[in-house]
A protein has these predicted regions:
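N-terminal cap/lid segment of alpha/beta-hydrolase-fold proteins
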Residues: 23-71
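Primarily recognizes the serine-hydrolase "nucleophile elbow" in alpha/beta-hydrolase
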Residues: 131-205, 223-224
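Short beta-strand element of the alpha/beta-hydrolase
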Residues: 73-82
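Catalytic nucleophile-loop/oxyanion-hole region of alpha/beta-hydrolase
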Residues: 89-91, 95-97, 110-147, 287-290
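C-terminal catalytic histidine-bearing segment of alpha/beta-hydrolase fold enzymes
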Residues: 65, 242, 252, 256-312
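Short beta-strand/loop motif that positions the catalytic acidic residue
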Residues: 241-243, 247
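Mobile cap/lid helix-loop segments that gate and shape the active-site cleft of serine hydrolases
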Residues: 46, 179, 188, 195-231, ...
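Active-site glycine-rich loops that stabilize anionic/oxyanionic intermediates
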Residues: 81-86, 245
């Protein structure tokens, strides 16, 4: 009997060791992605569409953070960090916002999308954003969320991506073999922090996507296809936007351009411009006045019934 038990124990230890050795590095927090959640999943079970390889830089993921109490309030948020499409500000524009939302009863998801600096030019990051929204909606029952209470929030380049996802969604294909592809990628609410709306223009942008990634020869086509302010229509979800007057990286005019497009389309939205604050302020701890913007977001979420189970 002792020999049998010893054999079972050794087998279990071997299995455990094997699992430890075969952890997926793309979904496990490490030196370069320590902001990943304990539960992080690949957006596609195999290679992602347009993948150039199978390294982590080729693998979009979604980190999942549970609400601080019970099953939460039935709302979900997908966070899209900024980083100029060359990196991801996964802590102060990702994990910290996941914590902020889970404290309020949300299920939070942080998207790690593919970067243009790794050869993934638009629309590839948009494919990842759409898939993230579809994934959360398709699995709404698993997460105890309402599939019609999905918020997306993006900052800087992540704001450009979030605005694109909100203005250029795919409806879903009811006949698709993959259940995730059957549902719409349209978010229900949009939150933007100092968004790089003018990424594909040079009139007000201090940084040009086309120059940065050497695609000036097709910049006009990219501008027409991937400028969110040109894609706004009456079906665009209501938005909350904040920016600072002194942002030297992404001028406030870019948010104004998007907000004016929302007004023209009749989409009821809210915008706050603060006098002071640099680009990339996150939760706004650099200025006493700017620290208040999360409270304004809290009020906006509350007004839309997203902080209460069952809505308003």
């Amino acid at each position: 009997m002792r020999r049998i038990l010893a054999g079972i124990t050794m087998s279990l230890l071997a299995c455990t060791a094997g699992l430890a050795q075969h952890k997926d590095p793309c979904t496990t927090a490490g030196t370069n992605n320590d902001w990943l959640g304990i539960q992080t999943v690949r957006l596609w079970p195999g290679d992602a569409p347009e993948a150039k390889g199978n390294a982590c830089e080729d693998t979009p993921t979604l980190s999942i953070f549970s609400p601080h109490w019970g099953n939460g309030n039935g709302s979900a948020v997908i966070v899209m960090p900024g980083g100029g499409y060359v990196g991801l500000a996964g802590v102060h524009e990702g994990r910290e916002f996941a914590d902020w939302f889970t404290e309020r009863g949300f299920h939070a998801f942080v998207l790690s999308y593919r970067l243009s600096s790794n050869g993934y030019l638009l629309p590839v990051p948009l494919l990842d954003a759409r898939r993230a929204i579809q994934t959360v909606r398709a699995r709404a029952q698993d997460y105890h969320i309402d599939p019609n209470r999905i918020v997306i929030i993006g900052f800087s380049a992540g704001g450009h991506l979030a605005a694109l996802a909100a203005t250029d969604p795919v409806p879903g294909n009811p006949e698709a073999e993959d259940a995730i592809d059957r549902v719409s990628s349209r978010p229900d609410y949009l939150v933007l922090g100092y968004p790089w709306i003018g990424a594909l223009t040079t009139d007000t942008a201090h940084i040009s996507y086309c120059k940065q990634f050497n695609v000036m020869d097709r910049c006009e086509a990219l501008r027409l296809a991937y400028s969110p302010d040109l894609l706004v229509n009456k079906d665009t979800p209501p938005a909350f936007i904040f920016h600072t007057f002194t942002d030297q990286t992404v001028p406030v005019e870019q948010s104004l351009r998007f907000y004016n497009a929302l007004v023209k389309a009749g989409v009821k939205s809210e915008m706050h411009i603060f006098a002071n604050g640099p680009h990339g302020v996150g939760l706004g701890g650099v200025d006493p006045a700017l620290e208040q913007w999360p409270n304004l977001l809290d009020a906006w979420l509350r007004a839309h019934g997203l902080l209460s189970p069952g809505g308003p």
